[in-house]
Amino acid sequence: MQIDLCIDKEKSSTEKGRILEHLVAQLLTIQQYEVVETIRVTGMEIDVFAKHKINNSTLLVECKAWESPLPADVISKLLGNVVLRHADQGWLVSTGPLSKDAKGIKSEWENKNDAERAMLSFYTNDRILDLLLNSGKIISSDQVKKKLESKYFADDITLMLTEKKYYWVVPILNNQYGTVSYKMYLMQQMENVLMILIY
C-alpha cells in the first residue's frame, strides 16, 4: 500500500509537506505531546517540534512528502539536528521510498542497541499506516474492501491524504469491460462514496 498527498494544482509543494506535518502533529498530540509545527531556529528549520507533557522528552520530526527516493543525507542532517539541539529523539517521516544508501543507514541504525536506537526512528508508509490504524484515524483497507463487496480488487490500494480528510482509493477491475474504476471512501463517513470511472 502507498500513501499519496493530494493538493490543489495551484498550491506549492510546500503545502503538500504541510499536510504530512499536520498529520504527524495530530498523531503526536494523541501520544501526549505538545506540538509546534514548522519552527525556524538558528541554522535550521524544524518541521515538527514536540515536547512530551508527562516526561518532558523532546522530539524533532523531519517530514518528507517526496515521490523520489529520499537521499541518505536527510538522515544525517536530522541526526545532527537532534544532537545539536539536545533533543531526546528524532523522527524521519517519509511517504516516499528511501534511496539505497538511506535504506542502508536505516538498517544499520535499527540494529543498534536499544539505548542508541531510541534516538532516531524511521516512519515510512507501513509504519505511518500502523500509527494511523492504532490511533483510530483510519480503518483498515480490508474493512474498506469488505464494504465494497467486489471480487476484483487491484493490489495497489492507496491512502490519499488531503488538507481536510483521508480517503482510501481502491481500484476495482471490471472484467466485463476491461476498465478500472476507482472508489474513494471518506474515512470519517463511510457512507459517502465517490466513484470515478477511468477509461
Regions found by a protein language model. Name each.
Residues M1-Y199:
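Mixed-charge (Asp/Glu-Lys/Arg
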